[in-house]
Amino acid sequence: MIQSITSQGLVLYNRNFREDDKLVKIFTEQVGKCMFFVKHAGQSKLAPVIQPLVLARFLLRINDDGLSYIEDYHEVMTFPKINSDLFVMAYATYVAALADASLQDNQQDAPLFAFLQKTLELMEAGLDYQVLTNIFEIQILTRFGISLNFNECVFCHRVGQAFDFSFKYGACLCPEHYHEDERRCHLNPNIPYLLNQFQAIDFETLETISLKPGIKQELRQFMDQLYEEYVGIHLKSKKFIDSLADWGQLLKEEKK
């Protein structure tokens, strides 16, 4: 079956196919993720809009049984600030890859599309890209079938405590129940508190967000633990972010 649709879409990636052709993965609002064939991509009028992290309204020909094609486009958004900063671009690429990993091809998920688009728009607007990534990570866990409660103790259900997290129980422990897991995470209590807040944040109303570097580092470390334990994916874009910690500071110093 072949259908023509017009849909908002975000280019996730492209890869070479044959000598001068490309396969382009686009996350569309209407039909989810699809792979598109672009012939003679280097000379094609589509060349400017098949780069990663380009958002546009595409006219698409969807073929359920063969190659799909991009017929036209308009209303292009290229996120110039993201693309001009290696660090922001690395995190933007990672959240796009997470969305890709969380969704089957040809599966519509308009709320996820809107969430990813808004995340990129807030990064482009200059909000803290590391914190936005943490929020995206914690909220998208449900797409991987993971639901975590950072609001109450798993034993007594009290709220507003200095919680720690237990992988043994997959939940939080209050101080009176720390003893239930000798291998609890020994987190800064601010980490479960922030993650509980992050789960409820609506990006449509978010105007500013700021955290101290030490807290952001602790969040990053714990999010890595959560993803390793519960999701188990190892994305190239995440490995690149990890490498930034080793040599990224040198680049920042050279810019001064």
Swiss-Prot record:
<dbReference type="GO" id="GO:0006302">
    <property type="term" value="P:double-strand break repair"/>
</dbReference>
<dbReference type="GO" id="GO:0006310">
    <property type="term" value="P:DNA recombination"/>
</dbReference>
<dbReference type="InterPro" id="IPR037278">
    <property type="entry name" value="ARFGAP/RecO"/>
</dbReference>
<dbReference type="InterPro" id="IPR042242">
    <property type="entry name" value="RecO_C"/>
</dbReference>
<dbReference type="Pfam" id="PF02565">
    <property type="entry name" value="RecO_C"/>
</dbReference>
<comment type="function">
    <text>Involved in DNA repair and RecF pathway recombination.</text>
</comment>
<dbReference type="InterPro" id="IPR012340">
    <property type="entry name" value="NA-bd_OB-fold"/>
</dbReference>
<keyword id="KW-0233">DNA recombination</keyword>
<dbReference type="InterPro" id="IPR003717">
    <property type="entry name" value="RecO"/>
</dbReference>
<keyword id="KW-0227">DNA damage</keyword>
<keyword id="KW-0234">DNA repair</keyword>
<comment type="similarity">
    <text>Belongs to the RecO family.</text>
</comment>
<dbReference type="Pfam" id="PF11967">
    <property type="entry name" value="RecO_N"/>
</dbReference>
<dbReference type="InterPro" id="IPR022572">
    <property type="entry name" value="DNA_rep/recomb_RecO_N"/>
</dbReference>
<protein>
    <recommendedName>
        <fullName>DNA repair protein RecO</fullName>
    </recommendedName>
</protein>
<dbReference type="GO" id="GO:0043590">
    <property type="term" value="C:bacterial nucleoid"/>
</dbReference>
